[in-house]
Amino acid sequence: LTQTDFVNGIRFENTGDTKISLDDIRVNQLVDYEMEAVTIPEGAEDYIVGMNVCSLWRNGEHTGWATITPYEDIRPVLGYYDEGQPQTSDWEIKFLAEHGVDFQAFCWLGRESDKPIKQAWDITALDNGFLPAKNKDKMKFCLIWEAANGATPVDRDAFRNYFVPYWMEYYFSNPSYMTIENKVVFAVFGADSLISKFGTGLKAEFDYLREEVKKLGFDGAIILDCNSYRTEGSASYGFDGWYAYNWGQQGCYYEANVTLNLKAKEDN
């Protein structure tokens, strides 16, 4: 039977025999706008190309635009856009997809370590921009768990009871989430903070994540260590591979990163 519930003046109505259950409510204002069609270039399917996205441009959540406005040569193509708006994300999707980019990897920073997660930190670009965008079916997304600066679970129970369910409900279950061979793609930045906490037990937690996503119909997860210096031992912590976060002056040089890491160890 159709059921209607009212919570804080908001009406929720099911269809058929679907049961209504609520654990959190997010309300966004929907503003209609015209959007140009996305034209995927020929040959774009020959490779899978992804791009790290570091969403730092919403005033009040991070440094905002004041950091770069003095430098006109790095002014964005979109101008100083309002991050976290669907229309902004639609233009980003259009520009990226039409230049052969298949998915965006968004940084995800936790707020809580030992309690249910209500909202991540600095995630407006994904939650309020990309996910409601009209063109999101033209591009996939995945998460980079930013464990270097965001909150990390206090123990395995917190990881399994708070972090994993949150990712599954809000992201992995989304049809736009990036998969390879029906496995969700999931990266970790700042894995050292997790390794220092869990040790080789980190592998058991990642294996738990792989099993949990099967409940959503996936065949597991591909978990990547986002670093440019740890080339051995990643598998013992549960990683399937590793990659460099950036391709700047040092990020693109494997030998340079290894040398810098060895020097840092010697200095310490």
Segments (PLM) and residue ranges:
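Glycan-processing catalytic domains of CAZymes
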Residues: E13-T15, K19-L22, N28-N268
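Noncatalytic modules at the cell exterior or secretory-pathway interfaces
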Residues: T2-F12
